[in-house]
Amino acid sequence: MAGGTGCVRLWGAARCWTLRRPLLAAAGGRVPTAARAWLPRGRRACDASPPWALWGQSPAAAGHWRGLWEANNRSGGGAFSGGEDASEGGAEDGASGVGGSAGGGEGPVITALTPMMIPDVFPHLPLIAVTRNPVFPRFIKIVEVKNKKLVELLRRKVHLAQPYAGVFLKKDDNNESDVVENLDEIYHTGTFVQIHEMQDLGDKLRMIVMGHRRVHINRQLEVEPEEPEGENKQKLRKKPKRGKKEAEEDGATKRPLEVVVGPGPSPAGEVLMVEVENVAHEDFQVTEEVKALTAEIVKTIRDIIALNPLYRESVLQMMQAGHRVVDNPIYLSDMGAALTGAESHELQEVLEETNIPKRLYKALSLLKKEFELSKLQQRLGREVEEKIKQTHRKYLLQEQLKIIKKELGLEKDDKDAIEEKFRERLKELVVPKHVMDVVDEELSKLGLLDNHSSEFNVTRNYLDWLTSIPWGKHSDENLDLARAQAVLEEDHYGMEDVKKRILEFIAVSQLRGSTQGKILCFYGPPGVGKTSIARSIARALNREYFRFSVGGMTDVAEIKGHRRTYVGAMPGKIIQCLKKTKTENPLVLIDEVDKIGRGYQGDPSSALLELLDPEQNANFLDHYLDVPVDLSKVLFICTANITETIPEPLRDRMEMINVSGYVAQEKLAIAERYLVPQARALCGLDESKAKLSSDVLTLLIKQYCRESGVRNLQKQVEKVLRKSAYKIVSGEAEFVEVTPENLQDFVGKPVFTVERMYDVTPPGVVMGLAWTAMGGSTLFVETSLRRPRDRDSDKGDKDGSLEVTGQLGEVMKESARIAYTFARAFLMQHDSANKFLVTSHIHLHVPEGATPKDGPSAGCTIVTALLSLALDRPVRQNLAMTGEVSLTGKVLPVGGIKEKTIAAKRAGVTCIVLPAENKKDFYDLAAFITEGLEVHFVEHYREIFDIAFPEERAEALAVER
């Protein structure tokens, strides 16, 4: 034994000479060679439990030491109690110690399963808080501690041969900290554990602990800090030699106190030590119920072990621990609960239960849940394993089949099959020579690459795109004008300019015998059918249709593709279009070209320059394909709401076609022909169930949908029919007829109620005409005297002023100042005695101040309003005008003539004044728009003055006579 490992551990465990002397005597007076590092260094005696209780990790060594202890006591040798006489007796004559030991005969046979001696009462324990699973008695658990104060306390306890602690479960499973600031954070019932092994991991301490019994916390204890070890060593070196009695007295008086128990409240801060008491279970009788529960627990444990072999080691450890667990209901209940993976509060309930039958019942409930979970896991495991086996078997069979086919010559290699597939695609296509050279080169490179390399997949994808382009493949176009016109008229009402341009394109293609691509741009307000007419054009021409939107696009790669060097690279939209349509002459709609963005990845509008240039797109170069592609036969149609935001070079490459808004009559026709039938079909109705008359549609257009397009009108019609469907299904009515009287029940109150602000215009107020996104509208200009004019030339400043309000833009403000200057000059020529505009302070306002207004077309209207105020005469009633006026009075042309004319007619105007250069725009309007209107085309403002103030003209003529 002297040279064995067990003796070395025993020697190290005996931390004072009082404990080492009997060991030395039993070993024949020889200190083990491997144990010389354990020589005493001023350690104090320990009055704790017997030393072998420290060595749970070496039960054989502990058993051997206990045998020496008992043999020494029987022979009368030196005791382990630390008595001085006994110690000397055992040390002075090593032979007598050995003889005494031999005289008593050999000690009892000690095995690895000999139970360790644990103190029955140990009230003061370090507190270790754990999460998720509590420690049950007779079970081992690995615990890690990071709290530095607690680590130091545990080391000190083990150093003093008191390797015991209390392990308690935290109430909050999410609290990973091992610092306990309040006893309310933990359950008060825990386990008294013995520390078997400690491993220092730097920032934390890992321990193997074994539970022994249940304990309950009484209160918190305060820990007194230990003196530094360096000071103790210095004191020991300076100690003079003293007698035995002095040493005993000094040892008794200077023994360190580690725990201070005070009657006051618990100290604030961390809880490191607690006072505990043992928890005793209630007395019980082994009744039939207990026997039945015990038997059922044993059966369930065996079932779980049969399903899950991972539990066998834990159960065998309990079975070999020196007691028959199956005969002890107390241990059996703990083992049953510890084997489960139940919730922490359920395990704590088992730990706190003192009634053994109830504890057995709770443990059995947890075991049953675990058994069901184990069965489910086993079933899922079998299913997964079966699937894996099937997949593996299928893979093996497929590989064998490939080899067999290859040996028989029935199947070619993967690379050969890929090459054959690509060449098969190109057989029916007219591939240009430069493209075919690239294909051959890539196929040769593909044959040299490994199937599993990344370059192989990149090359294969490139060849897939390159061979998917419809080289030389066209769709048969329809060059029949009558059929094309019928298709266009069938799908859309109005839009004569667009239809005429498409028919012209067909006529030119018919005369040439071939078609060429064109780039058209339809611009106009929202909802007028720009996008939908493109689909109808594709149907009329019998071309494939492809649409993509560039609104908000900021990446050039969306149009021209990515370089092949990028991961996941792919071609741009145009190449994708050719692959999808499988023709070289599709109709491509580029939507919202006026809303294209610009970002750090480039300017997409610049990328469109090459695409939409007829001279360049015959050799369009995509970044991904890197070979020229012919797009000269593609018909490009772009759509936009406004043209100002389209870059000038891009606008120059497109043929701009204006798609103006619809008038009320056109909207009514569209609603009756298209919108109402479509909405009826969408709502599951027919004419026998719901009826909308023309009067209802007219009222909808007039009071709810004044915008240029028909999208809002479509929404309102669908709303009416949805409510009609609800009434029919709910049983309120079998037939719903919508009339002008009950229209508000379906769509709510009217949005537009007043056509014009003034039925009779007073002096200083003139009706103008304006263009808006919703079409045209009337715009009144009001003028008023801001303060009385100064008639005394000797006092004050005779020069007047003009204040402008109504949220006007800069252009309109400049137009107002020009009109004010011209009006003063014109009035001086017309009536030199009238100084009103020279000396008065005038306020000019354009109503509806919340609506921003801008543009130069109100110049004539402002001049007329100022002159009306100065002459104190109203203008001709039911008169409206538009036109920009220069500083010399020349009337300049403006835009939006159609919308403004429609607005004037809707407001009941009978006479309108337009610039002479807008005569061509007016005569392009439909007859039903211009019918009933008196139109005057003017070049100078003098003509407008004669029209607006006929009385002034009559007076002037009378004076001349």
Curated annotation (Swiss-Prot):
Binding locations of ATP: G524, P525, P526, G527, V528, G529, K530, T531
Domain Lon proteolytic: 760-951
Assigned keywords, A-Z: ATP-binding, DNA-binding, Hydrolase, Mitochondrion, Nucleotide-binding, Protease, Serine protease, Transit peptide
GO cellular component annotations of the record: mitochondrial matrix
Active-site residues (renumbered): S857, K900
Catalytic activity: Hydrolysis of proteins in presence of ATP
Transit peptide location: 1-67
InterPro entries for this protein: AAA+_ATPase, ATPase_AAA_core, Lon_bac/euk-typ, Lon_lid, Lon_proteolytic, Lon_Prtase, Lon_prtase_N, Lon_prtase_N_sf
Enzyme Commission code(s) on record: 3.4.21.53
Biased composition (Basic and acidic residues): 245-257, 784-801
Region span, Disordered: 76-103, 220-262, 784-803
HAMAP family found in the cross-reference section: lonm_euk
Role, per record: ATP-dependent serine protease that mediates the selective degradation of misfolded, unassembled or oxidatively damaged polypeptides as well as certain short-lived regulatory proteins in the mitochondrial matrix. Endogenous substrates include mitochondrial steroidogenic acute regulatory (StAR) protein, DELE1, helicase Twinkle (TWNK) and the large ribosomal subunit protein MRPL32/bL32m. MRPL32/bL32m is protected from degradation by LONP1 when it is bound to a nucleic acid (RNA), but TWNK is not. May also have a chaperone function in the assembly of inner membrane protein complexes.
Name of the protein this chain belongs to: Lon protease homolog, mitochondrial
Lineage start: Eukaryota, Metazoa, Chordata, Craniata, Vertebrata
